[in-house]
Swiss-Prot record:
It is an enzyme of class 2 (transferase). The keyword Oxidoreductase does not apply. The lineage of its organism: Bacteria, Pseudomonadati, Pseudomonadota, Alphaproteobacteria, Maricaulales. This is Nucleoside diphosphate kinase. One of its GO terms (cellular component) is cytoplasm. The keyword Cytoplasm applies. GO terms for biological process: CTP biosynthetic process; GTP biosynthetic process; UTP biosynthetic process. Homotetramer. It comes from the Bacteria.
Length: 140
């Protein structure tokens, strides 16, 4: 496998409970490096743009409202097979179905407030990373 980069968001439910450090520890324990990170508050426009792929889905407005409800931590992660590895560390979207020890099993409050987002494919990561980070903000 090759070294990849992936994108992560620590969502408002997790930042509100001061879980950034605990989530970062799980990321690093999995062998992924955090090569860019910043804590921000998304505007409605940013959230709508980022989640635009879901615009026609019934949950879109609730998702946007949730994502602007508090600070988030956006990150670029790097490592061997980073996309698949981070998806394993995150666990299933529904925390009730997530494996023990995953971020969502340990920290998520619900399927909506599931603590983290991660890119699902190289193409997605290639779009999501520059949405929040310029090249000079990523320190490999």
């Amino acid at each position: 496998m090759a070294i990849q980069r992936t994108f992560s968001i620590i969502k408002p439910d997790a930042t509100a409970r001061n879980l950034t450090g605990a989530i970062n520890a799980k990321i690093e324990a999995a062998g992924l490096r955090i090569i860019a990170q910043k804590r921000i508050r998304l505007s409605r426009e940013q959230a709508e743009g980022f989640y635009g792929v879901h615009k026609e889905r019934p949950f879109f407005n609730d998702l946007v409202t949730f994502m602007i409800s508090g600070p988030v931590v956006v990150q670029v992660l790097e490592g061997e097979d980073a996309i698949a590895k981070y998806r394993t560390v995150m666990g299933a979207t529904n925390p009730e179905q997530a494996d023990a020890g995953t971020i969502r099993k340990d920290f998520a409050e619900s399927i909506e407030a599931n603590s983290v987002h991660g890119s699902d494919a190289p193409e997605t990561a290639a779009e999501e990373i520059p949405f929040f980070f310029s090249d000079d903000e990523i320190v490999g």
